[in-house]
Design a protein with these regions (language model features):
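A generic structural signal for tightly packed, nonpolar segments enriched in small/aliphatic residues
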Residues: 1-158
Length: 158
């Protein structure tokens, strides 16, 4: 496994997801999509009108975005470029759980997760901006259930 330096204890969700992404690999999946209210930074990037998508496979990202458009549960792709991978570097472990600085927080979280997805096509959907209403009443939106339902029922993944 990989060793992880904990630079921020508030970035614990990505550690749980990393364990899940590692564990699921033993089942040799063709595709894995994880969803989480992972970063507040996605609210800054996209507002509350779309979930953020990052993927190691462009076709999978496209299928998610298309399913979001068709279901009305929009998602928007953020880049996961090689340059973003450097945010996980540290001298004390294989990876750091959070990148330095304020920029690209959502992307840096996905860059960390991507280190655990080498054996399958993977996408992360950050639903921190879309999972709940803040006004007029605090409540869950049910998102991304419409997007995922459309993706599965459309058989795009086959």
């Amino acid at each position: 496994g990989l060793s992880v330096e904990i630079n921020n204890t508030d970035a614990e969700g990505r550690l749980i997801l990393a364990d899940c992404l590692t564990y699921v690999g033993k089942y040799k999946p063709s595709h894995v999509i994880d969803m989480a209210t992972l970063t507040g930074a996605v609210v800054i990037a996209l507002g509350r009108h779309a979930s953020g998508v990052m993927a190691n496979d462009q076709n999978l990202a496209n299928m998610i975005i298309e399913s979001g458009e068709e279901s009305g549960d929009r998602a928007w792709q953020l880049p996961l470029w090689d340059e973003h991978q450097s945010c996980t570097k540290t001298k004390y472990a294989d990876l750091a759980n959070i990148g330095g600085g304020r920029e690209a927080g959502t992307i840096h979280a996905a860059a960390f997760l991507s280190k655990f997805t080498n054996d399958y096509k993977w996408a992360h959907i950050d639903i921190a901006a879309t999972a709940s209403y803040s006004t007029p009443v605090k409540a869950g939106t049910g998102r991304p259930v419409p997007l995922i339902s459309e993706l599965l029922l459309s058989k795009r993944l086959n």
